[in-house]
Regions:
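Alpha-helix capping and helix-loop boundary segments enriched in small/acidic/polar residues
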Residues: 27-32, 45, 87-93, 152, ...
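Alpha-helical scaffold/interaction cores of sigma-54-like transcription cofactors
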Residues: 1-75
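Long, charge-dense accessory insertions within large macromolecular proteins
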Residues: 76-117
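Extracellular/lumenal glycan-associated surfaces
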Residues: 60, 97-98, 295
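Short acidic, glycine/serine/threonine-rich loops at helix termini
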Residues: 8-14, 70, 80-81, 126-129, ...
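Conserved helix-loop functional segments at active or binding sites
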Residues: 63-64, 81-84, 88, 104, ...
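Internal intein/HINT superfamily modules and their associated LAGLIDADG
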Residues: 106-411
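Glycine- and acidic
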Residues: 1, 34-44, 55-56, 69-74, ...
Length: 411
């Protein structure tokens, strides 16, 4: 745990008053711990100022060794997302509360659901941004340990190119199982839809779907009509792209598709799109359906890989995370501020994609996936564009996940 000097910012006025004799030193907030705190904090007027004091307190009160107490200094930056193991939602670390279940790596290298016992705010510290070759990023303190083939090592001791462990799968399943029509509409609109605000004052949400694929157009129409919307089609005279617009079922009523867009929090420009929060709470079957429909839009099935492209970096990161829920590892590539791609190239990952997500693909991509699956089966196990040394719950990405570290300061 690291603190401002003196202590957290809200303790600065108290420190000043006590330093000038305007306020007595008191441990009334911790009556049972005063005998431990007083010898350690007496010289700083009852306020923790130095990291060493925190380590001494942890040792005296909780029985930690100084080495174990040193681990308390290691932290993630504000805004880092923590996976709720019970619901599948991702929670900013500053909003994590005791009782929430998270994943912890056991000594057998398996992930276990464990409850959060306490949340410690560590104030402002220098952090660095770690970027792996596979596109993952973390913002954490330089002394935060990471798992390598040689064991746990502080980030500051890792040279460029060091392989680090990442989850081979996130064993979490939500509890939501929405109707197929809702899941399909959300995925199709997220991929090939226009859901930004429009109108003279920019307050009216859009819900337009664009495609030339007859199967996608039929699926969108079917699902929109199942919600009660009227659907109108417009064909571009030059490109042949079809625009499907929805209307309210009767005068004075609300367009149910636009209502869905608002309810799901999908009102956004292309570069701002994110996977709706509800999707992170889907059961595995609903999640596979969502990803299948989404890859039917901006996804590609190529000769040796599967990819998904987006103008939104956040959306690409969300997709990579959801794939990992199904045990599919991927790489994230960015070729500009509005050009991001999720790549699936490993043999086992392609086969798993074909098994779990393939049945929900629409249009010509389904046929191309069958050909790619056949090609992947002809490869030897482990043959591909990266090598994984797989433990029960983690994988060392030896070529595609070698870490690259760039320093920065922040909170």
């Amino acid at each position: 745990l690291s603190l401002y000097r003196p202590g957290p910012m809200e303790h600065i006025p108290t420190y000043i008053r006590r330093h000038h004799g305007l306020e007595p030193v008191s441990y009334s907030e911790f009556p049972h711990a005063e005998k431990y705190l007083k010898p350690i904090l007496d010289e700083t007027y009852g306020i923790p100022v130095y990291q060493e004091q925190i380590m001494q307190i942890a040792s005296a009160v909780a029985g930690y060794s100084l080495g174990e107490a040193d681990l308390l200094r290691r932290c993630l930056a504000e805004g880092s997302l923590v996976l709720d193991a019970a619901t599948g939602q991702r929670v900013p670390i500053e909003k994590v509360r005791p009782g929430m279940e998270v994943f912890s790596l056991g000594p057998d290298y398996r992930l276990y659901r464990v409850p959060v016992l306490e949340v410690l705010e560590s104030g402002v510290r220098e952090v660095v941004r770690l970027r792996t070759r596979s596109g993952r990023t973390l913002v954490l303190t330089p002394d935060h340990p990471l798992l390598t083939p040689e064991g746990w090592k502080p980030l500051c001791d890792l040279p460029l190119g060091t392989p680090i462990a990442v989850p081979a799968e996130l064993p979490v399943a939500g509890h939501l199982a929405p109707p197929e029509e809702r899941v399909t509409l959300l995925a199709l609109l997220l991929g090939d839809g226009n859901t930004k605000l429009s109108g003279r004052r920019g307050t009216r949400p859009n819900a337009f779907f664009y495609s030339k694929d007859p199967e996608l157009l039929a699926a969108y129409r079917r699902c929109a009509e199942a919600l009660g919307a009227k659907v109108k089609a417009y064909v571009h005279p030059t490109t042949g792209v079809v625009t499907l617009a929805t209307l309210a079922p009767r005068p004075g009523a609300q367009d149910p598709v636009k209502r869905l867009v608002v309810e799901a929090g999908m009102v956004a420009k292309a570069e701002e799109k994110r996977v709706p929060e509800e999707v992170f709470r889907y059961r595995r079957e609903a999640l596979a359906l969502f990803l299948g429909r989404l890859f039917s839009t901006d996804g590609s099935v190529e000769k040796k890989r599967i990819s998904y492209s987006s103008a939104s970096l956040g959306l690409a990161q969300d997709v990579a995370h959801l794939l990992l829920r199904l045990g599919i590892t991927s790489q994230l590539r960015s070729r500009g501020p509005r050009a991001h791609e999720v790549l699936i190239s490993g043999r086992e990952d392609i086969l798993r994609f074909a098994e779990l997500i393939g049945p929900y693909l629409l249009g010509a991509k389904r046929e191309r996936l069958a050909a790619l699956e056949a090609e992947a089966r002809r490869r030897l196990p482990g043959q591909g564009w990266h090598l994984r040394l797989v433990l029960p719950a983690v994988a060392y990405r030896v070529s595609e996940d070698s870490s690259a570290v760039s320093g920065s300061a922040g909170e």
